[in-house]
Regions:
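Accessory, solvent-exposed terminal regions and/or long lumenal/extracellular loops of proteins
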Residues: 518-820, 860
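A glycine-centered loop/beta-turn motif at secondary-structure junctions
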Residues: 283, 338-449, 850
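Short, hydrophobic beta-strand segments
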Residues: 153-155, 165-174, 645-647, 839-842
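Short alpha-beta junction capping motif
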Residues: 250-297, 360-369
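Alpha-helical transmembrane signal-anchor/signal-peptide segments
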Residues: 52-53, 465, 483-504
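Aromatic-Pro/Gly-enriched surface loop or interdomain linker
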Residues: 115-117, 173-255, 259-262, 409
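An acidic, glycine-rich "communication" segment
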Residues: 286-367
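Noncatalytic modules at the cell exterior or secretory-pathway interfaces
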Residues: 837-861
Length: 877
């Protein structure tokens, strides 16, 4: 009995010892896991505290001043604001009497404004106090999407002095006021001045700037209705002493008229500003007549094919192509000049003499009149519809409609295209899905049967709940550590940059998406030489549905311009919310980088050569003409390529997708593969090229453009802080003049002037028709040439094959020419043929027009039909 009791006691002691030992190991293991979990929490808190130092600085203040509160109590922070409602600011009440300030503001041209543009604002800050003042000027505006932006500038005014300055402030579509404040260095508001803007709401206006010694002669240009009053003109007199030296200063204008004025009075910077404004979409009209040397002489070397002659008196008929109530009412005797504009298209003529010639310059137009524009003032005042006819013929309906739509939709089209372009990121930031799935599977196995069976084996089931907690903390730490390489710790950027290079300047246009991973205020510093334009969408609810802009309205984005940097600050912005901006910088081409060469193009044959002067290799290089391209591929630094060694390919107009995919090589990849970096690079380049073609290469131009992609990653070029996290792509471009003449014979596209639609449905932007009914077009071959031959060039088959899934097909069917002798349409066989002048003679009108009918022989559907490109060769008259 005693022996059995001792054996039982011994076994119980041994079991207790074993359980105690197991428990000890379990407790020690639990302690280790718990310590690891606590360490993970500490690591997370430390990393969060150390991350995004700019957010902490933004919360503490920027440039030594406190950020305004973003809550509804902002009114308390602006107590006793001195209201300024007149033309000048009222003196503020300063308790110490150190600086007594007043503010005067004027804007635009004659205090007129237009949304969706940079608005020139002239500010005069008067200091009638006894001590100098140094502080900040803030301008608060509301963008077209209802977002409040604030622009801030450093200002200084000595005792008894007046500080004058001009600022260019982006004005959103629908914006009708700007709230100005002046604050001291400590952040206290000293002057508050709301300015209500004079913005036309009823009829969209086309702003015309007049640069003339006698602007009164051009008064007839004001108040004219264009294209059935789709637009209404408004003129403004410009002063050479106040003429801007940057193209941003001309952004408010749609048209610039130079007449009876010596352009050489302007500086080189002012002349360059005009040309870059034209390249960006402006329309320049030059009057000539007796003062042709003054107006055109400055531009003659770069605009004309040959020198112009001396002015002489000529009898012209302005009513030749314009219906007048009285026959002969358009006959005028004026001094005219025969001008040969490079790549020019005759808009108005009289008995074959060009009266108004225009040439496309990138996105803009340069037009030259053969006479002094003041000489037709009396005629235009009597026949007001002639201005409608002239501007509609010059601008085209597409440009007129775009100007009109800007009033209503603002930059929405640009916003959506930019969003598609840069709403991406670095693929290296994507997590490894399979690794996360494996860790999750291990966690579930350990958390369920694994942990339970382990504890049961040691008779420690009572610790299961604690084990679950500890195991969860451990795996949370593992997941967190796995995500360190994919986590954003501060503000990050995705961008797409277009670098346009000429022999004189390098222009960087960068579209950037700024995002921050925290719900806290943040800031980023840009290089000071960049201008900043927000890109926003239109407010879907229409004008007036957003909250009224007041002094108490907090801003979401602030742009602070100083000599050291341009700072973008954000507050009240949810984490990872995109803010889109267009950054621009123009600098002298000191190192003479870029592309140069010659391009010869005549009767379908390409020649010449191009050289890469960038100090690095470029990739996916291509020379693009209107409707044609030559693929050059990779080019080393300093390499020269002969264009005759490469195939000239005709692509479908307006179909940027197949063209970009062909140039960048995206089409060579199969299915989408985000793990393939080469595919992603091709896709990003393709997206940028599509954007460029859709927004910058939208119309006819006589020049060629060489495009390529940089092999260098200059991702922080626009940033002050070069350590910031960026990701993007850069495209390089240069314009090249095309020699399309031989022995005074010219070769050009007939589509340089939009055909007249006689019947049917035609889209001039893409040169296509609808197959539901026949299409009849009247082509204008140009009155400045004697036609020698005509060729209809078809799109390369490979583009049509690549475009099988789109809504565009090649035209197949019958083509008829109208015979002026018989009055009937004759069936023509044009496949691969060039028609000479003898074959064309029955079909050409005295004004060199050709009427063509297209009859589709396929099954009528909803697809557009790509028409062949008519190319004409002729000798200059």
């Amino acid at each position: 009995m005693n022996l059995r009791r001792r054996i039982r006691n011994s076994q119980e002691e041994r079991n207790f010892s074993v359980r105690t030992s197991k428990a000890g190991w379990a407790v020690r293991g639990t302690a280790v896991l718990l310590a690891g979990g606590l360490a993970f929490c500490a690591l997370y808190m430390t990393e969060t505290a150390m991350a995004a130092p700019e957010t902490k600085a933004a919360e503490a203040g920027t440039a030594g001043r406190e950020l305004p509160e973003v809550s509804g109590t902002a009114a308390q922070d602006r107590q006793e604001l001195p209201q300024v409602t007149g033309a000048a600011g009222r003196e503020s009440d300063n308790s110490r009497g150190e600086a007594k300030l007043s503010l005067e503001v004027s804007y635009g041209y004659g205090n007129n404004a237009k949304g969706g543009r940079y608005l020139p604002v002239d500010v005069e800050l008067s200091n009638s106090g006894t001590e100098a003042f140094s502080g900040m000027l803030q301008a608060k505006t509301m963008e077209s999407d209802g977002t409040v932006y604030q622009y801030e500038y450093q200002v200084q005014a000595g005792a008894g002095e007046v500080m004058s300055a001009r600022y260019y402030i982006p004005l959103g579509t629908g914006g009708d006021q700007i709230l100005f404040t002046v604050s001291g260095e400590e952040g206290k508001t000293l002057v508050y001045k709301p300015v209500n803007l004079n913005v036309s709401r009823d009829v969209p206006e086309m702003y015309i700037g007049l640069l003339s010694d006698d602007p009164g002669e051009l008064s007839y240009l004001d108040g004219a209705g264009i294209n059935y009053s789709t637009l209404r003109t408004r003129t403004f007199e410009l002063d050479e002493a106040d003429f801007p030296e940057e193209e941003i200063g001309l952004d408010l204008l749609d048209v610039l008229v130079v007449n009876d004025y010596k352009l050489r009075n302007l500086s080189e910077k002012q002349i360059a500003a005009i040309m870059y404004w034209v390249h960006g979409g402006g329309v320049l009209i030059l009057g000539t007549g007796e003062r042709v040397d003054d107006t055109l002489g400055r531009f003659a070397p770069e605009l004309l094919d040959e020198s112009y002659g001396a002015p002489n008196l000529r009898h012209i008929n302005l009513g030749e192509n314009f219906a007048l109530d009285e026959p002969g009412a358009g006959m005028l005797a004026v001094s005219c000049v025969d001008v040969s504009l490079h790549g020019g298209n005759v808009i108005l003529s009289s008995s074959g003499f060009p009266l108004l010639t225009a040439a496309a310059k990138e996105q803009g137009i340069i037009a030259v009149a053969a006479f002094d524009l003041g000489d037709i003032g009396a005629f235009c005042e009597k026949n007001s519809s002639f201005l409608d006819f002239m501007f509609t013929s010059l601008l085209g309906e597409n440009r007129i409609n775009r100007l009109a739509e800007l009033v209503y939709s603002g930059n929405s089209d640009r916003y959506w295209s930019v969003q598609t372009l840069i709403d991406t990121g670095d693929v290296d930031k994507l997590p490894n899905l399979f690794l996360y799935m494996a860790v999750t599977a291990i966690y579930l196995v350990l958390l369920g049967p694994g942990l339970y069976l382990f504890l049961k084996n040691w008779d420690l089931q009572i610790y299961y709940r604690r084990g679950v907690l500890v195991l969860s903390l451990v795996f949370a730490g593992i997941i967190y550590m796995m995500g360190i390489s994919t986590r954003f710790r501060s503000t990050f950027f995705t961008y797409a940059s277009i670098r346009d290079v000429t022999s004189d300047y390098v222009t960087d246009t960068t579209y950037v998406n700024v995002r921050n991973p925290y719900n806290r205020p943040y800031y980023v510093d840009l290089a000071p030489e960049y201008s900043v334009l927000p890109i926003t969408s239109s407010y879907w609810g229409g004008y007036g549905n957003w909250e009224e802009l007041t002094a108490e309205t907090p801003w979401q984005t602030e742009i602070v311009a100083t000599e050291e940097h341009v700072r973008i600050q954000g507050q009240n912005i949810p984490a990872f919310t995109s803010r889109y901006f267009r950054l621009e910088n123009k600098s002298d081409n000191v190192e003479q980088i870029g592309f140069d060469g010659t391009v010869d193009y005549f009767e379908g044959e390409i020649g010449g050569s191009v050289t890469n002067h960038f100090p690095f290799p470029v990739e996916n290089a291509a020379v693009m003409l209107y409707g044609n391209m030559v693929l050059l591929g990779h080019m080393e630094a300093g390499e020269t390529k002969n264009l005759a060694d490469y195939e000239l390919m005709r692509f479908p107009l307006g179909n940027s997708y197949v063209v970009a995919d062909r140039i960048t090589g995206e089409r060579d990849f199969g299915a989408t593969d985000i793990n393939n970096k080469e595919y992603l690079l091709a896709m990003e380049r393709s997206n940028l090229l599509k954007f460029y073609m859709d927004n910058y290469l939208t119309g006819y131009t006589a020049d060629a453009r060489l495009i390529a992609f940089s092999s260098q990653k200059e991702e922080t070029l626009f940033l002050k802080d070069k350590a910031a996290e960026t990701y993007g792509v850069t495209m390089l471009t240069s314009s090249m003049e095309v020699n399309a003449s031989r022995d005074r014979s010219l070769y050009r596209s007939v589509l340089m002037k939009e055909p007249k639609v006689v019947s049917g449905s035609y889209d001039s932007a893409v040169n296509s028709m609808a197959g539901m009914e026949p299409l009849t077009l009247e082509y204008q071959l140009g009155e400045d040439i004697d036609v020698e031959s005509l060729t209809f060039e078809s799109v390369n088959e490979e583009f049509l094959e690549a475009d099988r899934n789109s809504f565009t097909d090649a035209f197949t069917g019958s083509i008829y020419f109208y015979n002026y002798g018989t009055g009937n349409f004759d069936l023509m066989e044009l496949e691969g043929q060039t028609l000479d002048v003898e074959e064309l003679r029955p079909y050409l009108s005295p004004g060199n027009t050709l009427t063509v009918r297209y009859v589709y022989d396929g099954i009528a559907g909803y697809n557009d039909l790509q028409l062949p490109m008519p190319m004409v060769a002729g000798r200059e008259r």
